[in-house]
Amino acid sequence: MSEEQILNTHNASILLSAANKSHYPQDDLPEIALAGRSNVGKSSFINTILGRKSLARTSSKPGKTQLLNFFNVDDKLRLVDVPGYGYAKVSKAERARWGKMIEEYLTTRQNLRAVVSLVDFRHESSQDDIQMYEFLKYYEIPVIIVATKADKVPRGRWNKHESMVKKSLNFDQTDAFIIFSSVERIGIDESWDTILEYL
């Protein structure tokens, strides 16, 4: 795989968790952030592209990621898992705190190169997904759309679902759109090829 010539994707570890910028790593390593609704499969995405079973903790209970989690990949790149949005069982105050933390990171972090915005391939994008996409476009932050859980959609319906998701997002055709499945290991190489374009 081309990405392995550039970085050893299996040489990865969780570096730290941060609540605000005073806790961020203090160097110039490039970062790719991962954003998406609770339970869209962010942890599974991280584990799958890094070839690890449980580096990022997966949970059947949405809303488990409450801090910015920084993952070091081969000392050349960091993946940053931000708290999942759209989880109803969190208090308004807690949701507001998460929102502020995410916004501060996305709008002020010099290391940030692009955001992988994960959406559920089975459904139209939620209002939260649309707001996140519009936010990233407004701030001119490069965005990669990764449509997860593709194994739950029959292949004969993929074109229809891709069109549905893109239409609901008002998708910019210049952005990358990757169909992904952790279960069937679909979209791993394409995800890395796209991420590496931003380093």
UniProtKB/Swiss-Prot annotation:
Any single Pfam family the record assigns to this protein: MMR_HSR1
Regions that span the bilayer: none
Binding site for Mg(2+): S43, T65
Domain EngB-type G: 28-199
Keyword set includes Kinase: no
Highest taxon of the lineage: Bacteria
GO molecular function list: GTP binding; metal ion binding
InterPro entries reported for this sequence: G_ENGB_dom, GTP-bd, GTP-bd_ribosome_bio_YsxC, P-loop_NTPase
GO biological process: division septum assembly
The keyword Repeat is annotated on this UniProt entry: no
Cellular component GO terms held in the UniProt record: cytosol
Keywords from the named record: Cell cycle, Cell division, GTP-binding, Magnesium, Metal-binding, Nucleotide-binding, Septation
Cofactor list: Mg(2+)
Binding site for GTP: 36-43, 63-67, 81-84, 148-151, 180-182
Gene3D superfamilies cross-referenced by the UniProt entry: P-loop containing nucleotide triphosphate hydrolases (3.40.50.300)
Function (record text): Necessary for normal cell division and for the maintenance of normal septation.
Family statement: Belongs to the TRAFAC class TrmE-Era-EngA-EngB-Septin-like GTPase superfamily. EngB GTPase family.
Name of the protein this chain belongs to: Probable GTP-binding protein EngB
Organism of derivation: Streptococcus equi subsp. equi (strain 4047)
